[in-house]
Amino acid sequence: GKRDIKGIAGCWSNEGYFNYVVDKLCADITKNKASIAYYCTADIIPRCECEQCTRNPDKSARWWNYYARIIKSVRKRIPNVRFAGIAYQEFREIPNVPVKYLEYVEYCHYNRCYFHPLDNGACEMNVNSMKEFRKWGEKAPLSFYGYEFDVFKQPMYLPLWNVFADEMKVYRKMGLKRVKTEYP
């Protein structure tokens, strides 16, 4: 693909852009003495739609293949760094490719109902959400990234203690490696 310098998302099939990303990530890992790295694309940004980038129609697979390639390149320079990922945006869909080289994948649960308990079999939204979440567990070790506070900004946080208690029970049974909320 052709890199558009003015563009934000970058062309994932462009070697110059790929090398820029790897160099930047290596510099950040070294500067911060990170033992685990977590790289994600910018939020709500159109992706490159050139012929090479769209060769695979599965948008989620495009990201996970690209990320695996980044990880392999970074580890050539920094062999012991570990990586995590996030199932979010267009790459939250379960990809048609293996998800490789990760300690865990954080699943962004923005498709759940906060009124009903997470494992409530009568809530169709949560049944579908948990089905997808569990399927992700077949791709990589699971983690959770919550949006419980996403609609509010300081000082308007609304504590959802019953939601947190319910989630922790479910996630503990599932053996999740990590749980994180967007805020605070």
Residues covered by each model-derived region:
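Catalytic-core regions of glycoside hydrolase
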Residues: 1-184
